[in-house]
């Protein structure tokens, strides 16, 4: 089996690329970073530090790399069995034209073996969005052929990969946590379902997408925002602060009650999932900066994201949300000189006041009880 993976950054190398290579798949990375491309093609291998209770170093070998903006990547799309991405939500639109060209070439060459494309991004149904961009870039006479022979498979991914602090200045070395989860929608594949260790198949993807968003992402963000307010540097420092831990755990339990109502998750298993996530935040090997995790507060306070979406669920089912409100209030206090969204948030609150600002960012009714609760909590933190 041959695969092409867009994005040779830390997540690409440390998570998806590693799983594919470990499964014995012939893997080529596509990227724009020439330093990384040259290093991969010189060595055809790299090291991954896997850190949890202990630390181990795995070597990923037998890999190649091409530029994601040249002809080589188009040629590969015409030949491979699987295309994956870890480029960030914004970049999906930029790689779509190359994918479209590759699919046209595949059609012209008469290659009708099934191709599956999986975007492994921190977003909901990212592959469906990528498909829209690819379809827009395709000529009309290729669209029906692509619909027949190419599967666009949505996925949910979860692994903490902090920015590398390699002591060796090796551009390929990467550190990842032990935990990883890659869940894919098995109803969207063309041809036989792949057997890749570490890839989990489901016919109910949205349940797992929301489980991750409402638990890992909600908890991570609230830990960062409360941690920043309390003067902590890292996620580990913050979660070891008992006051912060109580709110974070409480918020994940509140969002968990929504998941249990909505999807029928088992309450005991979900409690164990929450405990596992708290353990991940405590990982001493992950130097995960609260400022990095907290960045882009406007996006994180938007209606479909990790703070407001679970809150809306508690309103839908009439469930408690005191700790989620604390997290939202802390997010409104997030300030960072390096983050344009943090500066925009501060300006918005200074201009409109916290009530109108939160309503504008989140889509919540300015006169609603929850906005009033959040503003009260926000003022209590000043």
Swiss-Prot record:
One of its GO terms (cellular component) is cytosol. It catalyses: D-mannitol 1-phosphate + NAD(+) = beta-D-fructose 6-phosphate + NADH + H(+). InterPro entries: 6-PGluconate_DH-like_C_sf, 6PGD_dom2, Mannitol_1_phos_5_DH, Mannitol_DH, Mannitol_DH_C, Mannitol_DH_CS, Mannitol_DH_N, NAD(P)-bd_dom_sf. Keywords: Acetylation, NAD, Oxidoreductase. Its EC number is 1.1.1.17. This is Mannitol-1-phosphate 5-dehydrogenase. It comes from the Bacteria. GO terms for biological process: mannitol catabolic process. Pfam families: Mannitol_dh, Mannitol_dh_C. HAMAP family: Mannitol_dehydrog (MF_00196). The modification N6-acetyllysine is found at residue 269. The gene is mtlD. The keyword Acetylation applies. GO terms for molecular function: mannitol-1-phosphate 5-dehydrogenase activity. NAD(+) binds at residues 3-14. PROSITE patterns: MANNITOL_DHGENASE. Belongs to the mannitol dehydrogenase family. The keyword Oxidoreductase applies. PANTHER family: ALTRONATE OXIDOREDUCTASE-RELATED (PTHR30524:SF0), MANNITOL-1-PHOSPHATE 5-DEHYDROGENASE (PTHR30524).
């Amino acid at each position: 089996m041959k695969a092409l993976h867009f994005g040779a950054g830390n997540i690409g190398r440390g998570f998806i690329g590693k799983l594919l290579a470990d499964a014995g798949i012939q893997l080529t990375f596509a990227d724009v970073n020439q330093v990384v491309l040259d290093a991969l093609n010189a060595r055809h291998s790299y090291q991954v530090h896997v850190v949890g209770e202990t630390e181990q170093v795995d070597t990923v070998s037998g890999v190649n790399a091409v530029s994601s903006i040249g002809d080589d990547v188009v040629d590969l799309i015409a030949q491979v069995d699987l295309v994956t991405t870890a480029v960030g939500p914004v970049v999906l639109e930029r790689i779509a034209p190359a994918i479209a060209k590759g699919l046209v070439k595949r059609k012209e060459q008469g290659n009708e073996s099934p191709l599956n494309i999986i975007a492994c991004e921190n977003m909901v149904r990212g592959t469906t969005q990528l498909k829209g961009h690819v379809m827009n870039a395709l000529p009309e006479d290729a669209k029906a052929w692509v619909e027949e022979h190419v599967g666009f498979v949505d996925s949910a991914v979860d692994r903490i990969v902090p920015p590398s602090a390699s002591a060796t200045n090796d551009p390929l070395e990467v550190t990842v946590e032990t935990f990883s989860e890659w869940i894919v929608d098995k109803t969207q594949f063309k041809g036989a379902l792949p057997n890749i260790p570490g890839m989990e198949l489901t016919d109910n993807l949205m349940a797992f997408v929301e489980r991750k968003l409402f638990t890992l992402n909600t908890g991570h963000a609230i830990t960062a925002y409360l941690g920043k307010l309390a003067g902590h540097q890292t996620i580990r420092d913050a979660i070891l602060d008992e006051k912060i831990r109580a709110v974070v755990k409480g918020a994940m339990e509140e969002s968990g009650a929504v998941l249990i109502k909505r999807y029928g998750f088992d309450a005991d298993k979900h409690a164990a999932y929450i405990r596992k996530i708290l353990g991940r935040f405590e990982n001493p090997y992950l130097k995960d900066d609260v400022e990095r995790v907290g960045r882009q507060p406007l996006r994180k306070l938007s209606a479909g994201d990790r703070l407001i979406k679970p809150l809306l669920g508690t309103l839908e089912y009439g469930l408690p949300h005191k700790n989620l409100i604390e997290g939202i209030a802390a997010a409104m206090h997030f300030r960072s000189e390096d983050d344009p969204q943090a500066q925009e948030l501060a300006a918005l609150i200074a201009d409109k006041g916290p009530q109108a600002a939160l309503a504008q960012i989140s889509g919540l009714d300015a006169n609603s009880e929850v906005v009033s609760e959040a503003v009260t909590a926000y003022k209590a933190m000043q």
